[in-house]
Amino acid sequence: MSAFMERASGVLMPVSSLPGPYGIGGFGWNAYDFVDFLASCKQHYWQILPLTTTSYGDSPYQSFSARAGNPNFIDFAELIEAGYLEQRDIDGVYLGSDPSNVDYGAIFGGRRQILDRAAERFAADKPADFDDFIQANEDWLIPYCEFMTVKEECGLKAFWEWPAELRTRGEASAKVCADHPARMLYHQMTQYFFDRQWSRLKAYANDRDILIIGDLPIYVSRDSVEMWATPELFKIDAAGNPVSVAGTPPDQFSATGQYWGNPIYDWDAMESDGFSWWEGRIRAALDMYDVIRLDHFRGFEAYWEVPFSSPDSSYGSWTQGPGLKFFKTLEEKLGTPPIIAEDLGFLTPGVIDMRDNSGFPGMKILQFAFEGTNSYYLPHNYIANTVAYVGTHDNETARGWFEGTATPRQREQAALYTHQQAGEPITDALNRTIAASVSDTCIYTMQDLLNLGNEARINTPATLGGNWTWRMLDGAITRELEHKLTDWTETYFRIPSEAEIELPQ
């Protein structure tokens, strides 16, 4: 296995955080404008968060499906142009009142109301390629649409709260779906629109030399079509409940650790058929994205396993994962997949060996570096085969950290290390430092480019509510920002065609 990334840079910007008129960022003209911004500043990557459906809590890392796209990102303007919506279908529907934040409660009902109107017209006038789409994706699409149809008929309850005969996919669930064809068609339609709109947007980005870094969560949600339709993939008991769930151990941030609640895979069963489910999942992700950030990479070496009945994550223990043989098997089937290893958190020699032997670039977070020691995260300790960030979606913004939780000692070290100039925002100094680093790739967060505080933080791990809501305001990107980002890119040779090192003659 070998490294694949060139010396370049990009921006982390969730699709949900784009501006736009329909309550949440999506695949409309604002997304195309964002691609144009990246291209004008000579960026090479647009990193996004998972595009899959979200469930309770609105987290893209807790989805009803590992494969289905999020209907919230469907652009209504395209549906108007195609004749499936009229402007009057949208006018008067409440989708939230604050353009800087997503109101998930509002869009849950409002966008569904609008898409229901589109579905009525769609039923009478399906696109010519709709049946081809269904046939090409039936392995995951049909189970997903059945799962969502039954879920809606059961009042949106978690599937283990459904009537007993519906808790596994079979004849009873098939009858429910046969009795409600309009619901089935609705979910097929939204996946069709999602696929076609995303494919066009990605092609537009690729044509401008912008590659998409997608995000692949390691786990699926307990309330997911995978647990319902393919329970054999997981460690479950006779009643269909998880034997154990995922989390993280106690650390300096939490005395009880993090209780994620995701079901644990039956890795032995997966290995017995050559990890075919994962092969399909990675193959699909590579169709959707150009590069994959593989979340919780250390979980493939060893994962924190918590007994299902435990009150918190402190009752868990480490269990060996499939290790390097998993990635070797993928390589045999897929070639060398372009994967970024999210190798943050508790690292052991085993995790480091697995990452290094895989050849995947790891991640460096500058915000973690300033502890008064020769930290692993200080840029002079980086290697080329890494991706450098000031912070990610799980961190405070740079300004929020520096003005808030950073200690005086951390602030002093950060200012000195980054050579912060008089009057220079600390966000610029930190961004400039990762741009100058030896890491092949550096990724800026959009909030840090805009010098925003923690009001723009995307997610605070182990908390509920107030996450995943930030949106960039229309017009926030200025010529000054474009010039600054271009200057960093050119100064530190992060344009792939110009990045080759010239040796002395």
Residue ranges and their predicted role:
Residues 2-7, 14, 58-195, 220-443, ...:
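Alpha-amylase-like alpha-glycosidases and glucanotransferases acting on alpha-linked glucans and related
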Residues 4, 29-54, 287-289:
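Catalytic domains of carbohydrate-active enzymes, especially glycoside hydrolases
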Residues 10, 14-33:
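N-terminal catalytic cores of NTP/NDP-binding nucleotidyl/phosphoryl-transfer enzymes
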Residues 34, 201, 351:
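Aromatic/hydrophobic pocket-lining residues that form π-stacking "cages" and hydrophobic walls in ligand
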Residues 39, 198-208, 331, 355-356:
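Surface-exposed amphipathic alpha-helices with a cationic face
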Residues 49, 211-213, 217, 291, ...:
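Outer-envelope exported proteins of Gram-negative bacteria
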Residues 187, 191-220:
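Conserved, well-ordered alpha-helix/loop/beta-strand core segments that scaffold catalytic motifs
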Residues 451-505:
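Structured C-terminal cap/extension of enzyme domains
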